[in-house]
A protein has these predicted regions:
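Domain-core and long-helix interface of multi-subunit machines
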Residues: 24-30, 35, 41-44
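Enzymes and membrane/adaptor proteins characterized by extended Gly/Ser/Thr/Asp/Glu-rich
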Residues: 37-130
Length: 130
C-alpha cells in the first residue's frame, strides 16, 4: 500500500474514515459553498454530479470550489454518470454528446475508442475524475 495513504489514514478519526466512503450527490441548484463545507467538515470522498448540468458557468463554479477543498490533505473525487445517449448529466459547451451504447456498438473499435477518449479528456479538463 502507498505509504502516504497509510500515513493519512492513521490520522483520520473513525468518522472521517467513514466519510471517505461517501460521494455526495450534487445538482445544479446546490451551492458550491454548502457542498465544499460539507466535504470539508465531514471529510467526504467527493461528489457525484446528478441532474442535467447545462450551464457551463455553474458547473465550473462547482468544480472549481470542490477541487480546491482538501480535507485532511485528501483531494475530493468528482464523478458523474456519462454513459451516452440520454444518460449524460453534463450537457455544456465543450463536452460532446456521447452516442448511445447501441450507436457505439455499430462503430468500429477504433472509432469507439476515439469517441470515448475525446469525451473522457473533455470531462477531465473540466475537473471530473470518474
Amino acid at each position: 500500500m502507498n505509504p502516504r495513504v497509510v500515513e493519512i489514514a492513521k490520522k483520520l478519526s473513525p468518522e472521517q474514515r467513514a466519510g471517505q466512503c461517501i460521494l455526495v450527490g450534487v445538482v445544479p441548484s446546490d451551492s458550491p459553498e454548502y457542498i465544499t463545507n460539507l466535504i470539508d467538515t465531514q471529510c467526504l470522498a467527493g461528489i457525484f454530479l446528478l441532474g442535467h448540468w447545462t450551464s457551463r458557468s455553474k458547473l465550473e463554479a462547482m468544480l472549481s470550489a470542490v477541487n480546491h477543498v482538501s480535507p485532511q490533505g485528501i483531494k475530493p473525487i468528482v464523478a458523474t454518470d456519462h454513459e451516452g445517449g440520454e444518460i449524460q448529466n453534463i450537457r455544456v459547451p465543450g463536452v460532446d454528446h456521447l452516442p448511445s451504447q447501441e450507436a457505439l456498438a455499430r462503430m468500429s473499435p477504433a472509432k469507439v475508442q476515439a469517441v470515448v477518449t475525446t469525451g473522457a479528456r473533455q470531462l477531465a479538463k473540466l475537473g471530473v475524475h470518474m
